[in-house]
Amino acid sequence: TRRLASVIEALDPDVVALQELDSAMSDRRRRDLLKQISEFTGLDYQHFFGGLAPINGGKVGPGLLFKKDLEVVKKKIIPLAGDEARSAVRVDFEKFTFMGTHLDLNNAKRTQSASTLVNETDFIHKPCFLAGDLNDSHRWGNGGIAFPVLADKFSIVSDTEGNTIPGRTDNGALIDYILFKDYKNSGIKIVETHIVRTLKVNGSVIDLGSISDHYPVYVDIEIPGLSGIENASRSNSIRIYPTQVQNTLNIQSESPVRKINIYSMTGQKQLETNNPGTASIDISSLSNGIYIVEIFADNGTAFKGKIIKR
């Protein structure tokens, strides 16, 4: 639980879809796993659990974490078909809706669930994201079994290079997705997306296959009127600006800056500067995308945050 939370903390997403969460099971001390994960991240999350499958006096199913500064308009649990009780969790925010799910292994019931989710969007009058383990793939024959039903309304916006199941090298193990259905040309833009296989966590780059049997998938989006970057780990004496950068990142620090590291979102170091002796750093050599910036000052203070390179 703590290791998974550390991955979420490192990625620092605004919304997280999780599956196979347990709540109130008698053999697990009646824990609320989603709440535990939320607390262990150390980030300012709300949580919404929607499991309907009964097990050992509790329930198992999907859930969402979302930052407390996102205004929630509505929350809903959507029952879905399955050999076990399946569901989707839906949260309507001010500017978009987000649904998380884990579809069934039964082909017919998975297809039925896909129809339920597609029909749900007919009553959602804003842009809508659907994320989770779909147990289906657009790579399968005929574009998948249930996937063509989803594709009637949704588009794939998440990374489709390689697989989301660690250790699988065949063409059929991409089953975790983030899908998007626009509404009235919302202007929402996809900035960057990755299947995250390695990540810098607590100072070390780790293989995320050692933490979960599915790799996390993330999409960074830009919503008109909302900032795409909220830096959660910051020092009062160090700040960076702007957070959406073209060539030059400016640094303001009360103490001389000793070291600057810039990492890709998947943990690879892209740039390192020691004793820069300047209030700015040239990042024009970096490709466009999302980066993590670490800054260390002589007085021992440190900063960690994100930037968008354009």
Language-model-derived ranges and their functions:
Residues 77-79, 99-107:
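Surface-exposed cleft-lining segments at the edges of enzyme active sites
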Residues 68-69, 183, 225, 266-268, ...:
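Solvent-exposed strand-loop boundary residues in beta-sheet-rich modules
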Residues 1-4, 17, 30-33, 37, ...:
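Stable alpha-helical elements in mature extracytoplasmic
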Residues 15, 21-96, 191-195:
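Structured beta-strand-rich core segments of catalytic domains in phosphoester-bond hydrolases
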Residues 4-30, 98-101, 117-142, 179, ...:
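Active-site beta-strand/loop signature of hydrolases that rely on acidic residues for catalysis
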Residues 76-77, 121-129, 136-226:
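Metal-dependent phosphoester-hydrolase catalytic domains
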Residues 230-310:
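C-terminal outer-membrane/trafficking sorting elements
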Residues 17-19, 48-51, 129-133, 156-160:
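Active-site neighborhood of phospho(di)ester-bond hydrolases with catalytic His/Asp-centered motifs
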